[in-house]
From Swiss-Prot:
<comment type="function">
    <text>Catalyzes the tRNA-independent activation of glutamate in presence of ATP and the subsequent transfer of glutamate onto a tRNA(Asp). Glutamate is transferred on the 2-amino-5-(4,5-dihydroxy-2-cyclopenten-1-yl) moiety of the queuosine in the wobble position of the QUC anticodon.</text>
</comment>
<protein>
    <recommendedName>
        <fullName>Glutamyl-Q tRNA(Asp) synthetase</fullName>
        <ecNumber>6.1.1.-</ecNumber>
    </recommendedName>
</protein>
<dbReference type="GO" id="GO:0006424">
    <property type="term" value="P:glutamyl-tRNA aminoacylation"/>
</dbReference>
<dbReference type="InterPro" id="IPR022380">
    <property type="entry name" value="Glu-Q_tRNA(Asp)_Synthase"/>
</dbReference>
<dbReference type="GO" id="GO:0008270">
    <property type="term" value="F:zinc ion binding"/>
</dbReference>
<feature type="short sequence motif" description="'HIGH' region">
    <location>
        <begin position="12"/>
        <end position="22"/>
    </location>
</feature>
<dbReference type="GO" id="GO:0005524">
    <property type="term" value="F:ATP binding"/>
</dbReference>
<keyword id="KW-0479">Metal-binding</keyword>
<feature type="binding site">
    <location>
        <position position="119"/>
    </location>
    <ligand>
        <name>Zn(2+)</name>
    </ligand>
</feature>
<feature type="binding site">
    <location>
        <position position="45"/>
    </location>
    <ligand>
        <name>L-glutamate</name>
    </ligand>
</feature>
<dbReference type="GO" id="GO:0006400">
    <property type="term" value="P:tRNA modification"/>
</dbReference>
<feature type="binding site">
    <location>
        <position position="231"/>
    </location>
    <ligand>
        <name>ATP</name>
    </ligand>
</feature>
<dbReference type="InterPro" id="IPR000924">
    <property type="entry name" value="Glu/Gln-tRNA-synth"/>
</dbReference>
<dbReference type="Pfam" id="PF00749">
    <property type="entry name" value="tRNA-synt_1c"/>
</dbReference>
<keyword id="KW-0030">Aminoacyl-tRNA synthetase</keyword>
<dbReference type="GO" id="GO:0005829">
    <property type="term" value="C:cytosol"/>
</dbReference>
<dbReference type="InterPro" id="IPR049940">
    <property type="entry name" value="GluQ/Sye"/>
</dbReference>
Length: 298
């Protein structure tokens, strides 16, 4: 039984298999939702084909099931949501809240990486152009349920950022806002590497006139070199054997109550214990080394 007032989600991109850092985000969002008897959805963010690995999406779903993280309802695939994104782009254009930009990346790099609004009043057409938001509601700070008030970089918050790429692909910030609104997500629990784009997403909620969700940004898992575990730096995929010791490591990473007798529990019993004892206030805010690396070095 669920209380539908809370809807959370886990939204991986199929650029590779899930690793320990991915599990932290998935488990944290799952526990936050289940502890409130809420709904937990899964969305596959497959809108960037050049970065996708064939078969990765199916593997990700199998990994979630193997670790006992069963979602509610159907999986939402961003590759099937293009019409919704086109409608959102059309609405912004009709309201005068976006414009075409033909500035090359090299020009923006010369500006220090922050776009200066050069094309805002030039009335370009769509040929060989990106679409940028005409920033009306810059968000300078937001509340994170774990970290408190987070201040944004003023230049980044005020930038007219891209919502449709020159190569025809929909930008992440547009797609994620349209889909979170569509799915009724009330709180987004994800990794701290996504703190920076949050203010852009919040500004889009304001542009559309939609109610924004709450946010929780979990600590990042690092490798031995202090870099974030990611598919790009070849983080090892989650183990395919007994998921329980890995889940216990993830719970410890998240600062949760130690599960002393986990060897005597099934995966389902272990997760029920974790839900019953979940405390967001116990989650650390600083990044840390994956316990598997720490244990290996002892």
């Amino acid at each position: 039984m669920t209380d539908s007032h809370y809807i959370g989600r886990f939204a991986p991109s199929p650029s590779g298999e899930l690793h320990f850092g991915s599990l932290i985000a998935a488990l944290g969002s799952y526990l936050q939702a289940r502890a409130q008897r809420g709904i937990w959805r899964v969305r596959i963010e497959d809108i960037d084909p050049p970065r996708e690995v064939p078969g990765a999406a199916a593997t990700i779903l199998r990994q979630l099931e193997h670790y006992g993280l069963h979602w509610d309802g159907e999986v939402l695939w961003q590759s099937q949501r293009h019409e919704a994104y086109r409608e959102a782009l059309a609405w912004l254009h009709e309201q005068g809240l976006s414009y075409y930009c033909t500035c090359p990346r090299s020009r923006i790099q010369r500006l220090g990486g922050i776009y200066d609004g050069h094309c805002r009043t030039l009335c370009h057409g769509p040929e060989n152009a990106a679409v940028r938001i005409k920033q009306q509601h810059p968000v300078m700070h937001f509340h994170d349920a774990l970290r408190g008030d987070i201040q944004a970089d003023p230049q980044l918050a005020s930038e007219d950022f891209i919502i449709h790429r020159r190569d025809g692909l929909f930008a992440y910030n547009l797609a994620v806002v349209v889909d979170d609104h569509f799915q009724g997500v009330t709180e987004i629990v994800r990794g701290a590497d996504l703190i920076e784009p949050t203010v852009r997403q919040l500004s889009l909620y304001k542009q559309f006139g939609w109610r924004a969700p709450g946010y929780v940004h979990l600590p990042l898992a690092l490798n031995e070199q202090g870099a974030k575990l990611s598919k790009q730096n070849h983080a090892p995929a989650l183990a395919t054997g007994d998921p329980r010791p890995v889940l216990v490591q993830a719970l410890r990473f998240l600062g949760q109550r130690d599960v002393v007798a986990w060897q005597e529990m099934s995966v389902e019993e272990l997760l029920r214990f974790a839900v019953a004892h979940w405390r967001l206030t116990a989650v650390p805010t600083s990044a840390n080394v994956n316990p598997a690396f720490s244990n290996a070095s002892r």
